[in-house]
Structures are given as C-alpha cells and as structure tokens.
A protein has these predicted regions:
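Class I S-adenosyl-L-methionine
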Residues: 1-44, 66, 77-82
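Cysteine-dependent PTP/DSP-like catalytic domain, specifically the C-terminal lobe
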Residues: 33-43, 60-151
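Class I SAM-dependent methyltransferase "Motif I" SAM/SAH-binding loop
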Residues: 49-51
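Glycine-rich SAM-binding Motif I of class I
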Residues: 53-57
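Polar, glycine-rich mid-to-C-terminal structural blocks
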Residues: 151-165, 175
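Glycine- and aromatic-enriched alpha-helical transmembrane segments of multi-pass membrane proteins
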Residues: 169-187, 191
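Conserved helicase/translocase motor-coupling segment
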Residues: 185-205
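Long, continuous compositionally biased terminal/linker segments
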Residues: 205-219
C-alpha cells in the first residue's frame, strides 16, 4: 500500500500567526495534493464543511503553482466562536468570519509570494504564472429569506396589503440583495460579472454582459 504523510505544522503556525484560533487546521498541502489529482485545472471545488477555508487557501496556492483557473465554493454554518478564545478577542464572531478573513489574507500572500518568486527569476518564463492572471477574488453570500414582499390574502388585511405593495421589496434589503435574488430566479450564476450603468438619474445593473438588465429605481 502507498502511504501519504502530511502534517499540519505549517498550517497551524500560519493560523496562529494570524490569530485565527484554530488549534488543529487541515493541512493545506494535503488538500492541495487531493485537488491536484483532479485532471481539470478549471474545475469547481466544493467544500460543504469548510471551517477556516483551508480548501480555498489550497486552491489559490495550486492555481499560483500550475496556472490553473480552479474556483471554489465554501459552505459553512455560522457557528459561534467561544467567548474566551483568541479569535473572539480579535473581533471574529463566527467560524464564517474567520474563513472570510483567511481567504482575503491567504489570497494576498499567495499573490505577493508569486510576485516575489517571479522577480527573483527576472523574466516571465513559459511555464510561470503571471500574477496579473491570478484570480484571488471571492464573493460572500448568506442564506436568508426572500427579499420580495410576501402576499397575505386574508380579506380583512387586503387593504393594508395593497399599501404594502407600493414596493415589491422589503425595506431593509439592499439593491445587491435584490439583484442576486433576481439572478437566481432567472437561473444565472452568482459568479457572473455585474456592472453598473448610469442612464440619466437611473442606475441599471448589467448582468453577464447584456444577459440581464435590472433597474430598481421607483420610476
């Protein structure tokens, strides 16, 4: 039998240096090795128990090494952090908060390390990855209730409900909240690019280069 040995010492050291408070994080090198076994360099890596987002960290490192364009989806319940923990004292409230910040810092480090590596070589060789091509961006979505006002058809509440529908959307929701729900209802990926267009006093969202236009102005 083949035996693979990986330890998490470097991952633990990095997590402690960043005061994330994870005593036993998964080995970034081990996750990176598993991902490298997938033939496609353009796959989507899904981690349904993402914890501190080691999988996202490993994905970005591997892309920096072999020029892949892998993407990741991290899913994690917003578990509360212990009150007396170092991470709590640093301002993190949930495991998701730690994961988000780790992705930011890991992405910046992966890119800066790649720039430093290329500067030592002096010129960009054929198999080297251009730092400008390395995508370290990500979006954060939280599962919640619909942004649309719910219709209540009880007769004695009919008049008040009609007044509510002066706006189709809940008052405490942002335009981006509404936009992304509209994208989902139209079957559009949340990774599609969104740009803002000004037309007079109106703001229009262009989704996926003309695939969908959304204007949320009252008039």
């Amino acid at each position: 039998k083949s035996v693979l040995f990986f330890d998490s010492q470097s991952s633990t050291k990095w997590m402690k240096a960043n005061k994330f408070g994870f005593d036993f994080p998964k080995s970034t090198d081990f996750i990176k090795y598993i991902i490298s076994m997938i033939p496609s360099k353009e796959c989507i890596i899904l981690d349904f128990f993402s914890g501190s987002a080691t999988t996202a960290h490993a994905t970005m490192e591997l892309n920096a090494e072999d020029g892949g364009s892998r993407k990741f989806i991290m899913v994690q319940l917003p578990e509360l952090i212990k009150e007396n923990s170092e991470a709590k004292s640093e301002g993190y409230h949930t495991i998701c908060d730690i994961g988000e910040e780790r992705i930011r810092r890991a992405g910046e480090k992966v890119k800066s390390d790649l720039i430093e590596k290329n500067n030592k070589v002096g010129t960009l060789l054929e198999n080297q990855v251009d730092p400008d091509d390395l995508d370290i961006g990500f979006k954060v979505f939280k599962l919640g209730s619909s942004n649309l006002t719910e219709w209540q058809a009880e007769f004695d509440e009919l008049e008040s409900n009609i007044d509510l529908f002066e706006s189709n959307f809940l008052n405490d929701r942002s335009e981006l909240d509404i936009l992304f729900e509209i994208m989902l209802k139209n079957g559009l990926d949340l990774t599609y690019p969104v740009t803002e267009i000004s037309e007079g006093s109106h703001k229009i969202y262009d989704v996926a280069s003309g695939n969908l236009f959304v204007c949320l102005n009252d008039n």
